[in-house]
UniProtKB/Swiss-Prot annotation:
Residues that coordinate or bind Zn(2+) 1: 5, 10, 24, 64
GO molecular-function terms, A-Z: metal ion binding
Full protein name: Cysteine and histidine-rich domain-containing protein 1
InterPro entries for this protein: CHORD_dom, CHRD1, CS_dom, HSP20-like_chaperone
Gene this protein is translated from: chordc1
Purpose of the protein: Regulates centrosome duplication.
Native source organism of the sequence: Xenopus laevis
Length: 334
């Protein structure tokens, strides 16, 4: 009877009688997610694509392991008797909440239909070096050889499938994969197409696919694709900075255009990924004194405030649509 190996990066089924010291290729480390990069603590290889991360070949050989790692136990929060006694001594009274006055919005707010102007791009030396290295290593990232044939050992690109190409017979196998995307939320890990959730990353990797199909050995080139990207903002009295954590952005394809109250952002990074964002600004900016800084790890959009003041938020809240007025004729009263 075959058993399932729970070593990180393996997930294969094996025969216990043939389990030797070099049967399993796995990762002894732990998964590391940092600045949109994914990898293992025991390896130096990093990638931004989750399916590529799952297909990273292990760096250590050993025996297969069929022992499922225990899931972390969440500590229970208990209320002691001392806390209950202290709560009884608290004075009971009605709290009076005083709210600060709402900020006064500008009366003469410029129209959002004003002409847009592209902001100045400032390219850092670190980004130039990173782009030069990427151009030199483009040939090393191809999966197929010059004849167009799939190489032995190529991993299936379907999410959740850990099979590798072993020859023409691999094309006849049924691929069990996840058609959705991985979701990490509040310590839980799962696929959007399944309801099975776990807090252990190793268990998440071994979740069997919920969809049957054929293996995908090479990715289809769909050109530029719009993807989400982590971003945030902070402010000083003089300006607002929007940070977009996109690595290796391409200056010739990326731009930011703005007028006094609207900003349109397009960042092309990692060769084929595009981040787009339209922001209706809460305040008013000086377009001529605003600019964009491109570095190897992120893009920073500096917006010079037209007035030295604190913004309540970055975006102007959308006004709720007014309810349709009903034309009713009042009844005549005698």
């Amino acid at each position: 009877m075959s058993l399932l190996c729970y070593n990180r990066g393996c997930g294969q089924r094996y025969d216990p009688e043939g389990n030797s010291d070099d049967s399993c290729t796995y990762h002894p480390g732990v998964p590391v997610f940092h600045d949109a990069l994914k990898g293992w603590s025991c390896c130096k290889r990093r990638t931004t694509d989750f399916s590529d991360f799952l297909s990273i070949v292990g760096c250590t050989k050993g025996q297969h392991n069929n022992e499922k790692p225990p899931e972390p136990v969440k500590p229970e929060v208990k209320i002691t008797s001392d806390k209950k006694e202290l709560a009884d001594f608290k004075p009971k009274f009605n709290e009076l909440i005083i709210q600060a006055p709402k900020p006064i919005e500008c009366i003469n707010r410029p129209s959002s239909d004003e002409p847009m102007a592209k902001l100045q791009l400032k390219i850092s030396a670190s980004l130039k070096q990173a782009l030069d290295k990427l151009k030199l290593s483009e040939n090393d990232k191809t999966v197929t050889d010059e004849s167009g044939e799939i190489k032995i050992g190529t991993s299936c690109k379907n999410g959740g499938c850990l099979k590798t190409f072993a020859g023409p017979q691999s094309n006849e196998e049924v691929c069990h994969y996840h058609s959705g995307v991985p979701i990490f939320h509040e310590g839980m890990k799962y696929w959007s197409c399944c309801r099975r959730k776990t807090s252990d990353f190793n268990t998440f990797l071994s979740l069997e696919g919920c969809t049957k199909g054929t293996h995908l050995w090479t990715k289809k080139d769909d050109g530029k694709k719009v993807v989400p990207c982590r971003h945030d903002w902070h402010q000083t009295g003089a300006g607002v900075t929007i940070s977009i954590y996109a690595k290796n952005s391409m200056p010739e394809l990326s731009y930011v255009e703005a007028n006094s109250t609207v900003v349109n952002i397009q960042v092309v990074f990692e060769g084929e990924k595009t981040f787009q964002q339209n922001v209706q600004l809460w305040g008013v900016i000086d377009v001529a004194k605003s600019y964009v800084s491109l570095t190897a790890t992120k893009v920073e959009v500096f917006l010079k405030k037209a007035e030295f003041m604190t913004w309540a938020r970055l975006e102007l809240p959308q006004k709720a649509p007014a309810p349709s007025e009903q034309n009713e004729t009042p009844e005549e009263q005698e």
